[in-house]
Amino acid sequence: MKEESAAQLGCCHRPMALGGTGGSLSPSLDFQLFRGDQVFSACRPLPDMVDAHGPSCASWLCPLPLAPGRSALLACLQDLDLNLCTPQPAPLGTDLQGLQEDALSMKHEPPGLQASSTDDKKFTVKYPQNKDKLGKQPERAGEGAPCPAFSSHNSSSPPPLQNRKSPSPLAFCPCPPVNSISKELPFLLHAFYPGYPLLLPPPHLFTYGALPSDQCPHLLMLPQDPSYPTMAMPSLLMMVNELGHPSARWETLLPYPGAFQASGQALPSQARNPGAGAAPTDSPGLERGGMASPAKRVPLSSQTGTAALPYPLKKKNGKILYECNICGKSFGQLSNLKVHLRVHSGERPFQCALCQKSFTQLAHLQKHHLVHTGERPHKCSIPWVPGRNHWKSFQAWREREVCHKRFSSSSNLKTHLRLHSGARPFQCSVCRSRFTQHIHLKLHHRLHAPQPCGLVHTQLPLASLACLAQWHQGALDLMAVASEKHMGYDIDEVKVSSTSQGKARAVSLSSAGTPLVMGQDQNN
């Protein structure tokens, strides 16, 4: 970049120290010069005292892309110290050569943060200590980097932009010492501001013992000003999880409050300090990024084992009895008991995505999927055997045909194989009838133990005719009145006698004036 390009700078920005005034830069500061939507960064080390606005700097300033908005702070690394500067706009038409002369006039001033006249608005950043003193000191592994201590009135209510011609003075405070310097950090550092690489401290400042949020609580927290656009998304949050230390905490470095206001989310201060009756909530960025907060993680002991049961289990002879507290049914293992408890609670956690049908077990859902896919992996390859009253099987046996039926589950194939072998393993204990499936035996048991009849009969077997006549006495009286008028006789008694098969043998009508008696002979 040639010298005439420096003269065409429409609006230059001078670095302004946070705590002092002056017009020169220290040689170790990485300086950035702004023009419009570009930033000029030094490509080579600076001399002892030089002004980057001078025309002599135009030959080694290289343009870099700049973010849409400018930040209020610039972090400059000086050895192991981190100094924060703010860009100060220079008025249009300022002589760059005059600025260089002002910088050279401050060259021989004593080190430290020195302030000159506030009218000319010249600022400088000096070495906090000389190089010879730095070489005599031992290794600075136990020392912390200085950080800016923002005053209370500046952090709570910043002045408006039109009144902030010069930044408020800020003091540099030493940070608490750290234990050790880690070369490999256990966390991923995301840049909040891609256009400002200097806004993030160097990696050696982040150690296991102290986090940036502990050392410098206001680091990376810009003032709450709506004029600064949102430069970082809340999902790009940094998190540190220290597994090696028992007192490890989860700390997050959040962008300035304007980022949360622009996205319509709550401020970090509101999430950290909720009301007295409200529970603390986690950062929304962590949930959106796919990282769950430790506060929401339930211990594994409450999810597995006997702790998941709503009641304690009993022990007998040193062994745990997996017994249901509702129906008293016992099981051999805990998983079967948990599945059984879903029958009483009505819980069906496994749902089909196609037909929305729910199941109590995952195996049932997997078997149900075969209904939608039409897959029948289980095939019968046994020749037909003549069965009892099974004409089709007899014809197939004569022709020596092989059954090629297919089934979606192995249980259905097992039941089908009983048809070929003629096995009937389920036998009734009352009438000695045998069945191929257990469900057929359960339906057969209802014939031997009929349920008590109610007022409403949905199914009316022959054995419940006597019960029907007993409960509907009023209907029989109405029938008697109608018969007397039209047929000339009354229905005084209905005699119903049934056999064990439930068939009615005799129903007698008499004209005697005796009351209706069920289940008794006419002589009685």
Curated annotation (Swiss-Prot):
GO terms for biological process: adaptive immune response; cellular response to ionomycin; innate immune response; negative regulation of transcription by RNA polymerase II; negative regulation of type II interferon production; positive regulation of gene expression; regulation of extrathymic T cell differentiation; regulation of gene expression. The keyword Repeat applies. A zinc finger (C2H2-type) spans 322-344, 350-372, 398-420, 426-448. One of its GO terms (molecular function) is promoter-specific chromatin binding. Pfam families: zf-C2H2. PANTHER family: PR DOMAIN ZINC FINGER PROTEIN, ZINC FINGER PROTEIN 683. This is Tissue-resident T-cell transcription regulator protein ZNF683. The gene is ZNF683.
